[in-house]
């Protein structure tokens, strides 16, 4: 999301170097952010945008979010579906339409809170559906599609009675930005998370490790992605709650298995 907001300004490219470093003190506080791996620190305090994504650089994306400012980042979040409940097409057939609880990205945040939100921490809250829509938006060239519960209805002889038509909820970013995000998400797999790779298939992904709350040493392991990156057929979001593994290892194998199963059909 922060990477998309940066690319949309036209001032950043995948190889643009941004501030990183081994630690970053949240503005106006004594709280320091660090990175899980040394590659995320960059070199001489800087890292390319692509490598910041590939190595999950907390220090880089926290500083980037602050540099972009609350308006640009929160606006991108809203375009992607945050801060609004999401209705699911087809669910009204049950008599009670299914509406997903709204994900949340803070608005009018102070710089310290914006820095935390920019790495998925602090007051940021996201459902698996929301994060699946983010992955799908990149796969769809920047268009956020309305999720559907039923693809088609068939009669007893298997003929199609009705077919759900895809509907666009919003355009979050340009197709050019989507292409650059795809390149960066592929680097997540090729540079740092080879366990997510599928033979003969280009996989685009982003891992995440979210803290659950004060006093809880367990984490939520996340991964989102789509495949094939050059001709997307499936977008996935997986979260494994209350684990002690990074997202790549907790949620990654599940995403990989889902993709393999879907692409084998």
Spans of model-derived segments:
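Short, gly/Ser/Thr-rich active-site loops of penicillin-recognizing serine hydrolases
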Residues: 159-167, 253-265
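Intrinsic structural disorder
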Residues: 134, 192, 230, 244, ...
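Short, well-ordered alpha-helical segments
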Residues: 179, 249-256
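Beta-lactam-recognizing serine transpeptidase/beta-lactamase-like catalytic domain environment
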Residues: 4-240
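A short acidic/glycine-rich loop-to-helix N-cap element
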Residues: 240-252
